[in-house]
Amino acid sequence: MAIHKIKIFSGRGSEYLAEKIAASFGTTLGQSEVLRFSDGEFQPCFNESIRGCTVFIIQSTFPPSDNLMELLMMIDAARRASAYKVVAVIPYFGWARQDRKDRPRVPIGAKLVANLLMAAGVDRVMTMDLHADQIQGFFDVPVDALYASGIFVPYIKSLNIEDLSIAAPDMGGAKRANTYAKHLSAPIIISHKERAKANVVGKMTAIGDVKGRNLSLIHISEPTRRRGIS
């Protein structure tokens, strides 16, 4: 069976993390650059041959949208340079909160991003802690949805925190927080949000006993603080 050489590249949105990943893999990042033009456009370029290679491109797609566009263009460039496989490693999957129509006449941003990645020619996607697990179903290519709990649970255990509770920032994060709570044998606190409008929380209620507890994960709300968190 043919073995295809692996090469790791980074977009400008994840350079530090990409260097750490490459070092852990026992290699260095591949040579690439992004050319800037006077009208504001940019053009990624691979500065070494990737023909027949399995190419990993590490790039988060958080705003600004240039990060997403840069990733799409790098995937396209790798395809046109005859890479064997192109794997997009997306530590932070932007637009993941837009996983459904929560009101009339709005897009489903996460599905659109999935379509764009597939149209660019990606063969596989790897990402961390998706906002909604169902986003994996938006793709027609394999998606490796990884979880940070494998790293953070041992770390939190090593701190030997007394009276520990695990907090979820909202109902959507309850499943993830529950995973931590089970591994850490700790009770869970959930925040229930009622939004007045986009990005504005009109009311937040902490569900669970937080008085005198040490909370871990993820956002500690003001209502939670007022109820006696230490």
Listing of model-derived features with the role each one plays in the protein:
Residues 30, 34-49, 96-102, 106, ...:
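Short, glycine/charge-rich flexible loops or terminal/linker lids adjacent to PRPP-binding catalytic cores
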Residues 32-72:
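Active-site-flanking structural segment that lines cofactor/substrate pockets
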Residues 21, 88, 129, 170:
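Residue-level signature of catalytic and energy-coupling elements of molecular machines
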Residues 103-163, 198:
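Anion-binding alpha/beta catalytic cores of soluble intermediary-metabolism enzymes, centered on
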Residues 218-230:
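Single conserved hydrophobic/aromatic residue that forms the stacking wall/gate
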Residues 5, 54, 84-87, 123-124, ...:
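Residues at the starts of beta-strands that form the adenosine-phosphate
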